[in-house]
């Protein structure tokens, strides 16, 4: 079987599996977030944290709960890393010292669902920090994104109310009823596929082919690997992430990890459709996500398999930075999945991709990670773009835009526009400051267009809460740890505040009956229009700097 055929088969099987499970999982999540019953474990948690599960919150109260939970999580994880040398299961001789700047960057990274790593995981973080700190945040940060998405959906579904649900109930249910059961199943499948799960520190000594002895770190990898992909987190137990054979040993586990990445983001549109009372609306949102994803992944695969150049031509594809057990095509699919969502996990080295292949991974994030996007964040980002599309369509026909019976007034469009502009502002401002500082330019391992691409990728990844990297710059410095940490905080929390404000505004409205002039938002025309509006907006925003970076490199 040729690499191209194998890649197409890999992609087709993923699409088929996602299509098969997204309806039952979406329906299950609908029941989770609309149920009036609490389990015994949930009631115990509510008593411990002092939450009233029957008390509803306004958008402001919901937002304050998100901010408070995130702040406490950052402080806890920051402190846990700094004192890990006094805790059980710590590394006796870590390769990278845990400075306050690095601890801040890492704490913010995992709390914001980014999982940007300026360190090598297996030689820096002890097992207790990995389990009680990083893995826990992999669960709760994903649940926060899902909770915010559900709050926005309630804004569309409810009428004449200021209440969006209860953040603490949404957080607990998302973890106990959705993420934890799926992660357990995923971890067991990964262990069956060869991923490791132990408490070895640096005790595994093996003999290499040359006869030398090599010490290989172990750890509780499979448990963290499952939620890393399922929650679209992406932070690896090992420095090389899912390229490491202990994390992702075989083509089967590679397929499974890809499937876990896409599972919840593609199922949430079904949940959305059920909650607003029109399954067709969910199908339309899923179709938009799917169209963007298929186009991006196919183009990335083509650019990696057929790119010009002496070495790629000689070997038949761009094999640099690619694991032979996966191959170019499967790696390109994984790269597309991980950057179209907010995952950021990698099974190949994006910095070694062809210039235009690397451009695709960056452009996926600059789209706002909406095809299908992160767990929760992909759905609310897609709904924001649907609102903008409805507004543009309303301008063309001269009528007040409506979406799902809710009028898109100046307040709603201002919030939607602010959401769309927030992340590009962080990306472009951060990149400009980094390139303007001689000290930061000195940390670049490459110059010219590719050097600019590496800096742009770093801020694109952190501001969009992705976490993958081109890795050609030295980011474990006080400036980069601080600057990228701020990009992650503002890139996560500012959009969440705007989404919740929009949800509150929509929930306060009644429903306008459909008329002859109402734009149908469940038909193929709307799907195509939304894809077009998205591409145009992103191109207008990022084309100038992309022309100086990966496009210039590709043309050269």
From Swiss-Prot:
GO terms, molecular function: P-type potassium transmembrane transporter activity; potassium ion binding
Pfam family, one: KdpA
UniProt subcellular location: Cell membrane
Keyword field: Cell membrane, Ion transport, Membrane, Potassium, Potassium transport, Transmembrane, Transmembrane helix, Transport
UniProt similarity note: Belongs to the KdpA family.
Assembly notes: The system is composed of three essential subunits: KdpA, KdpB and KdpC.
Protein name from the UniProt record: Potassium-transporting ATPase potassium-binding subunit
Protein encoded by which gene: kdpA
């Amino acid at each position: 079987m040729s690499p191209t055929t194998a890649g197409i088969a890999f992609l087709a099987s993923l699409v088929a599996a996602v299509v098969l499970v997204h309806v039952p999982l979406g329906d299950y999540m609908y029941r989770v977030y609309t149920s009036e019953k609490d389990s015994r474990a949930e009631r115990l948690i509510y008593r411990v944290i002092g939450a009233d599960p029957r008390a509803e919150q306004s958008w402001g109260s919901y937002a304050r709960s998100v901010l408070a939970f995130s702040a406490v999580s950052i402080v806890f994880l920051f402190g846990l890393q700094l004192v890990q040398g006094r805790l059980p299961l710590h590394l006796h001789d870590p390769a990278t010292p845990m400075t306050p700047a690095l601890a801040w960057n890492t704490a913010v990274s995992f709390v914001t669902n980014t999982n940007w790593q300026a360190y090598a995981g297996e030689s820096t973080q002890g097992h207790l920090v990995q389990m009680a700190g990083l893995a826990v945040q992999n669960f709760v940060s994903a649940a926060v994104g899902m909770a915010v998405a559900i709050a926005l959906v309630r804004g569309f579904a409810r009428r004449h109310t200021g209440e969006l649900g209860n953040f603490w109930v949404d957080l607990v249910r998302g973890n106990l009823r959705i993420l934890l059961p799926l992660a357990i199943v995923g971890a067991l499948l990964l262990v069956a596929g060869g991923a490791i799960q132990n408490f070895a520190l640096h005790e595994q000594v093996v003999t290499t082919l040359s006869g030398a002895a090599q010490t290989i770190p172990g750890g509780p990898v499979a448990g963290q690997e499952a939620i890393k992909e399922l929650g679209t987190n992406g932070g690896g137990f090992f420095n090389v992430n899912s390229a490491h054979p202990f994390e992702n040993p075989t083509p089967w586990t590679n397929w499974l990890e890809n499937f876990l990445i896409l599972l919840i983001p593609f199922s949430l549109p079904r949940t959305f459709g059920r909650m607003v009372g029109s399954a067709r609306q969910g199908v339309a949102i899923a179709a938009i996500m799917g169209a963007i994803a298929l186009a991006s992944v196919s183009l990335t695969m083509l650019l990696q398999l057929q790119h010009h150049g002496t070495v790629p031509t000689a070997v038949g594809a761009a094999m640099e930075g690619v694991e032979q057990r996966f191959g170019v095509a499967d790696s390109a699919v994984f790269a597309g999945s991980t950057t179209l969502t907010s995952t950021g996990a990698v099974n190949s080295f994006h910095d070694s991709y062809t210039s235009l292949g690397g451009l695709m991974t960056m452009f996926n994030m600059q789209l706002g990670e909406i095809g299908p996007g992160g767990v929760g964040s992909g759905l609310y980002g897609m709904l924001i773009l649907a609102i903008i599309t409805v507004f543009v369509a309303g301008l063309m026909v001269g009528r007040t835009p409506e979406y799902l019976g809710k009028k898109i007034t100046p307040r709603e469009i201002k919030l939607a526009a602010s959401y769309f502009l927030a992340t590009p502002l962080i990306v472009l401002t951060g990149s400009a400051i980094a390139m303007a500082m001689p000290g930061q330019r000195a940390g670049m391992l490459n110059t010219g267009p590719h050097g600019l691409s590496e800096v742009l990728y770093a801020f694109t990844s952190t501001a969009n809460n992705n976490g993958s990297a081109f890795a050609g710059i030295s980011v474990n410095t006080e400036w980069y740890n601080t600057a990228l940490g701020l990009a992650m905080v503002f890139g996560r929390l500012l959009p969440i505040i705007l989404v919740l404000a929009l949800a509150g505004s929509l929930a306060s409205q009644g429903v306008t009956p459909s008329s002859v002039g109402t734009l149908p938002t469940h038909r193929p025309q709307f799907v195509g229009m939304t894809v077009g509006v998205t591409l145009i907006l992103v191109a207008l925003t990022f084309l100038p700097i992309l022309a100086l970076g990966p496009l210039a490199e590709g043309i050269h």
